[in-house]
Amino acid sequence: MAKVINSSTDIINLGIDSSKKNLIITKDSQSAMQLMNNIQNLSNVFLLENSELLPYDFFSMAPITRAKRISSFSSFLKSNEITLVASISTLLSPCPDPSHVTPLNNLRIGENFNIQEVIDNIILSGYVREDFVSLPGQYALRGSVLDIFLTSGKSPIRIEFFDNKIETLRTFNPESQIANEKISSVNFLPSYEYPINKISIDTFKQGWRDSFDVFEEDSEIFTKTMKLRHAEGVEIYLPLFFGKRTTFLPFLRDVEKVFVQLDTETKAQEFEELIQER
C-alpha cells in the first residue's frame, strides 16, 4: 500500500529501509530533484530523470539524460535493495521494455574478448563510432584499444586487449583522453531506450504500416530507422520497436514500499489532459 507524503522533506522522517526496494513518486520533476537532495545520505538511491520533452515532441532527449535514465531503469530492475525517485509524468511517459535494459556484456580482466562480437552488440544497441569518445553512446577503436562511453557510467572506459584477452580496464578523461583509475569489470548497457536490430526494425516497420496511412519515404524517422540509424524524435514511436505498449508497470516487480507525494493524482490527471490536447 502506498504511503502519502506531504512534501519533499517528509520523506526524511519516514525511515526508508535501504535494504528494501522502494519507489518514491513526486508530483513534478522539481519536487523529485528536491527530494533527491534531502536523501543523499541513503545508499543506492537513483533518480529517474524526466526527458524534459512534451508529449509527441519530435525531439530526442540529451545524451546525458538518456544515459542516466537507462542506468536508473537497469539498476531498479535488477536490484532489490534500491530506492528510485521519479515524478508522476516521468512514470506515465513511454519507457523501454525491461528486456532491453539488461546488461549486454559483463567484461572482466583476463577473460576472453571477441572484439567483433562486442562491436556488433554495441552498434545494434545504438552506440556510434567516433574518432574520440566524449559523450555517452559513443565508441572508438584504435588497434587493440576500445574506448566506450557507457550509458551506465560517469566516465568513459578504455579496454586494452591482446590475443583475444582483456589486459586492462580503465576509466579515462574524455577531454584529455588520459587514462585514470583501474577497474576490474564493466557492464554494457544499450545507448538508446529502444533496440536497433533486425528483429526490432521489422517489428517497427510492421507496426508503422499498421498504424499510419502515409508514404513511408516521406518520413525521415522511418527512412533513418530502416537504415539502423537514430532519428531525432523517434522515441515517440517507442512501442513500435517492441510490438506493444511499453509502460513502467513491469518495473514494479518486487517493490516493497511506494511513497506518493500529495497532489500527485491531480498532476497525473493534468498530464493525461496534456497528452490528449497534443
List where the protein language model places each region:
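ASCE RecA-like P-loop NTPase motor cores
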Residues: M1-R278
